[in-house]
Amino acid sequence: MVSKASRDQLRKYGAVSLASLLVAASIVAYRWWNAAPSIEVEKKLRRSVSRCVVVTQGIQNEDMIHDLLFEDTVMLLAPGCTAEGRLKSASRENAYKVISCTTWQSVWACVRHFRKHTLLVRTSEVPSGVPADIGGYVSDISDI
């Protein structure tokens, strides 16, 4: 038989061993999870910027447009742009993000309404240029 003092000492060693094991496992798990961002985190970081893209005739056939449709992006089809059917069929679940505008005034009205972080537009294809007040509705205007 084991004496009471020996049992108490075994319990203490067991408790200390268990605590040490838990601390070591916690440290390993913490370092493993924080070593590199996961794919989901990278996607969230990439998506964190909302965009509004004015699709004109010159850029309607570029692959970049199709890739942006899956992110937090609204596609505004400028007057004369014929890519509506192709963009909507590329991703039926994101078809609601493709908006066809009949006038340039309606394009700028949509940009003002959506207030996205970034506006992507090919300024050389905009007949009267980007209106001066658009900078108050978006944080960044990028010429593509």
UniProtKB/Swiss-Prot annotation:
Top-rank taxon: Eukaryota
Keyword line: Membrane, Peroxisome, Peroxisome biogenesis, Transmembrane, Transmembrane helix
BP-aspect Gene Ontology terms: peroxisome organization
Subcellular locations according to the entry: Peroxisome membrane
Pfam families: Peroxin-22
Similarity annotation: Belongs to the peroxin-22 family.
Protein name: Peroxisome assembly protein 22
Organism (species): Eremothecium gossypii (strain ATCC 10895 / CBS 109.51 / FGSC 9923 / NRRL Y-1056) (Yeast)
Gene that encodes it: PEX22
